[in-house]
Structures are given as C-alpha cells and as structure tokens.
Amino acid sequence: MRAQLKALARPAWPWIDQVQEVLKRLVKLLFRAWKRVNSLDIPLSPLQWILLLYIVFGFSYTAASPVFEANDELWHFGFLQHLRETGSLPIQEFDGKETVYAQHGSQPPLYYALSALLTAPLDIDDIDEYRRLNPHVRASLPNAYGNKNLIIHDASLSLLRGAGFAVLLLRLFGLALGAGTIVLVYKISEFVAPQRPTVAFVAAALTGLNPMFIFISASVSNDSLAMILNGALLLLLLRCLRDGFRPRNSLFIALLFALTSISKVTSLVLLPALLLVGSLVLYRTRDRRGAMIYFIGIVVFWMLVAAWWYLRNVQLYNEPFGMMTMANIAGPRGMTFSLVNLFSEFQQFRMSYWGLFGALNIQLSAIYYLLLDLMTLTSFAGCVFLILQLLAISDFAYARYELRHLALLLMTVFLLSIGVLYWSTLTYRSDGRILFPLIAAISPVLAVGFVEMIWWIVFSLRPPNLEFVRA
C-alpha cells in the first residue's frame, strides 16, 4: 500500500522536459513566421489568427496532457493496439473481462485503420509500461479532491520513443484534422450568412478556441476524423442546395457519407439531410439525371465502403449499429430513465462540451461555464428571432436562401440531440463531447443566433441612420 501511494505521488507529467525543446522550436518557428508576415506587411485574416491561436494552444495541450490522461485516449489507443497485433477488429464479449479497448471496441474502424498505418513504423511493445491504471482514480467527478490521474506514470519513460511517441504522433495528427475542421466551420458559416462575415468569424472562434475542442483534437480520438469528414460533407450539401446537382459534387457527397459512416455512428444523423437536400434540389431544378447520380451514388458508395461493418454487427451482436453492445460494456443505466435523470446529468454534459479535462474530473472556473450558458441561451433566442424574421420576409430570394441553409443545420442539430437523448437512456456515459462529430453544424447555428441577437441589442441602443449597416 505504501509503495502504491509513493507511485501515485510522482509527478503526472515527468516526460514534459523530453519534448520541451521540440515544442520550443516549433513555437519559435511560428513566432519567426509571424514576424516575417508582419515585415512583409501581409496582415493575417481573422481565420488565420484563430488557426494560429489554435495551433499554439494545441501544442500546449499536447505537452501538458500525460500519456493516456486525455478522455478515453487509453481505450482508443487500445483499439489501435489490437488492430496492429491481430490484424482484425475486436469482437466484444460479455464475460466481464477487461480489454484494452473497453466499450470502444464497438466503434467503426476507419480512424483506427488510418492510425495503424500512420504508426506502423513505430514499435509499441512497451505499451504495458504506460498502461498502469490508478485503482483509486475518481473519474467523472469534477468536484472530487485528489486522485485525478487515470494512470500511474513512470518518470523513466520517454515520450520520444515507442508507444509514447506513437501517442504524440497521433495527437499531432488530431491537431491537423482539427485545423481542417475550423476552416470548414468558417466556410459553412459563410454559406449560411454570406452577408454577415462576422458570423463566420464567431463560428470559427467558438470551435477553434473552445478548450474542449482543442483538448479532444490534441488527443487520440476518432472524433477528430469524424469532425472533419462531417464538416466537408455539410459544406458540399450546402453547395448542392445552392448550385443544384453537379456530378463531381454528388459523387464526393456519396464518398464522404460512406467514409464518415465508418468513422463514427453519430454521423448517420446526416442521412436525413442528404435525402432532404436531394429531394429539394430535384423539386426545384427537375434535374432527374442529376438526382439519379446523387441518390444512386450514395447507395453504391455506402454499400461498397461501409455496409460490411454494419452487417458484421448484425452477425455478431444482432444489431446494426453496435450501440446496445457498447452501452452494455460501458455500463448500462440499469434504471428507468426520466426527466429528473436528464436534468441531473445535464450539468456535467454541458460542462464537458466547453471544457472538462482528464477523466472528466478537471473543471474550469464556474464563471466560465456561466458565461457560456448565457451565450448559448442568447444564441438560441437569436435563432428563433431570425427564423421569424426570415419567414416574415420569405418573398425575398435572399430570405429564402438563408432560411434553407439555416434550416438544414438546425435539422441536423435537432436529430443529433434526439440521438444523444436516446444514448443517454442506455448508459450513464453521455457527455457533451459526443456532440463534437457534428460541431460543424453546431458552431454556425450558435454563431448565427448570437450575432443576430447582439446586432439587435446594438440596434436598439443606437439610433438608426442611413449610414448604419448591418454587420
């Protein structure tokens, strides 16, 4: 017992010194690049500033988070380890035995296959030296004192070799995917509100400067891949809604939907959006040939790329999505779900969307969550107000344009909320992070509503005149 307490008393991040020089060099390179840009008198755009801050914070998170201390990183890497060692996907058993992948063995395999290819040259045979679980950890208890660490860390281990370096490499891979997601959020917001560039800036900031988004991106997680794939898919859907059917665009939509279906089950909530966009464009343009390419492409690509995994689930678990299997392994709720349960668990749910670190047991200041709650409520009120305005002036082409695009994102967010509510009825493990695969729909909606409400507040405080232009 005394030896265990001694091990737990060791610093949780002894290996930071080993990568400090590498990170210092990266920061110096960024600083020199920034000075070079200024010396050439090339100002950075708002999006570029957000990306720069995201990268700086992302490197900091990468260094500050000990190996396997990021949320579920231990089991995501366990899936990768199993795939590398056996060359096959995990088969979930209900015999009570612990596995290296836990409930995440039920996840779709695309992210883990890419990660296995990325880390193939690396030797991870020392993985067991990193995977020393803290038996006294107080996970998912942000108000608990002490025992925050999931792992007992060994000061002699290096992050620059073996499994430690594989984790570092995958974290940097996740950061790159996160940067792509921020760009896509910005582009999607430009589609939704082309006359208000402020919306795109706010949406990108709500994504790239969200501490939890940075934390998840700078960890080993399949959320990073799902976020960028879903963002690209939503952008192409909005483009199809605006421009009509284009063969290349339709085929890319079909391919992206197939890929994202095999990266995260959450992505399937985009299927109604695909069907709705195709139907609306067909009704508006009467382009039957384009519609055939669009709908047949979706079916063919999905059957070729993703169908096998869902059929495998049916054969193994008698369910296509694997959700019941995952919930049973994660820990079934074991009681009747009610609104009382929903409200009691919502506090941690909303905290874990904006920032709840480690094993969901390291929280930020209460004022931070309060301010973001106010912002979220303001955004929802602004969305309702904007929709009422657009419906009132729906005779104008621009109003119909903005209403169509906003409605597509709102429908996606609504269906995602229904899916999260269903998942919450199955297991206790429902945190705000599970919304991230569709953050490319959530952030633009929040930004549109927030900017709309702030604009009307400013408008009411400032006397209108001919020079006043809507931001």
Task: State the predicted function of each range.
Residues 36-45, 244-245, 282-296, 382-411:
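Membrane-interface helix-loop-helix junctions at transmembrane boundaries of multi-pass membrane enzymes
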Residues 48, 137-157, 161, 185-209:
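Transmembrane-helix signature of polytopic, membrane-embedded enzymes
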Residues 54, 203-208, 235, 257-261:
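Short helix- or helix-capping micro-motifs
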Residues 82-172, 330-333, 361-365:
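Interfacial juxtamembrane loops and adjacent helix segments
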Residues 190-194, 233-249, 260, 282-284:
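Membrane-interface transmembrane helices that cradle and orient dolichyl/undecaprenyl
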Residues 249-265, 270-271:
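Membrane-interface alpha helices of multi-pass inner-membrane proteins
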Residues 314-393:
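Membrane-lumen/periplasm interface segments of multi-pass, membrane-embedded glycan/lipid transferases
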